[in-house]
Amino acid sequence: MSKKNYSIELVADMLSTSKYVVNQWVKNKSIRSIKPNGKTYIPKNELKKFDKLSFLFSKNKFKKPKPKKNYKIIELFAGCGGLALGLEKAGFKCVMSNDIDKDSCDTLKFNRPKWNVLHKDISKISNKEFLGYKDVDVVSGGFPCQAFSYAGKKLGFEDTRGTLFYEFARVVKIIKPLICIAENVRGLTSHDQGKTLSNIINVMEEIGYDVVNPEICQAIFYEVPQKRERLFLIGIKKRSGLKFTYPNKISEPYTVRDALKKGRLYKTNVPNSNYQKYTKRKQQIMRKVPPGGNWNDLPEKMKKEYMKGSLHLGGGKTGIARRLGWDEPSLTLTTAPAMKQTERAHPKENRPLSIREYARIQTFPDNWKFS
């Protein structure tokens, strides 16, 4: 990818469609393509045809927010701190964070010793404990997507009891912050035929919050060099007079090169750190895969050896023997970079991504240590 040309894959990701659809546009000459070095690219100017991508040509630059005061937040289901850290960068002060996972809490405590980190099942934290945070401005968190039990009726707050969303809503109801922020997987929009999301919005309305039109945000448009989509639900306290608009998108997505090398995103190359090792034979196989390639790039004999019985199964299997490309955003990172179905190999070296490379692609600072 250059600033003037985008790959088929990236255009598909930007438009939330498939490579097949984009290839059909190219084949039908609906959009113009070029083939430098034999690979198909779409000139950036061709993307003016899509209203969804008009921001790529906007003169309004991406602006980082500047808070008018020191807002306080509580972060629920905090994990290792990605969302809380992002809010901190935006000027918010985290006064309490909670997660059930010990390693996640240890990570938060090590990196932010002044934060009040509760390693506890959220359902075991009493209402009384949360009453001590009535001055908090924002409650945020990414509760897991769960189905609700109902018989065709519209659910109220108490009907969601037993789910982690109920716990999120319980805290919001107690503290009554100006804003609540919930992030979740894209699949929540279609979960249980859309009923899960509809009931979540109904409950937020019941406890006193107007939900801004839910939006699926693509990380590549917000200074993150990774193809990751997340659904954001923003609740605004009723009669607060507040208005919310989603931030401007950047005009040029960041790439793996930006994440791992000195340049636009970081002032230094990525520091060395631990990584899993491939077997000797796996290294020999991965040497045949070019940057941005996968098992389809292997010689036929090696394909049969590596793919075995899955060679003739359906599906693209594009995650197998997958090597990241330098000049594209990273694929969505998984918890297992060396697992065969979800491999994320270094663009050049014959190995999975390292811990610090994983962190950089998610825009964690180099001094953020993981337990």
Region annotations inferred by a language model:
Residues 1-21:
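Polyanion-binding surface elements
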Residues 5-10, 28-56:
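Short helix-start
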Residues 19-20, 281-371:
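C-terminal target-recognition/interaction regions appended to catalytic cores
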Residues 20-25, 49:
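DNA-binding alpha-helical recognition surfaces that contact promoter or target DNA
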Residues 26-27, 205:
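Alpha-helix C-terminal capping/helix-coil junction sites
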Residues 43, 232-236, 334:
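Short, well-ordered beta-strand micro-motif
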Residues 55-178, 186-190, 195-198, 205:
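Core alpha/beta nucleotide-donor-binding catalytic domains of modification enzymes
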Residues 128-136, 146-318:
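Class I S-adenosyl-L-methionine
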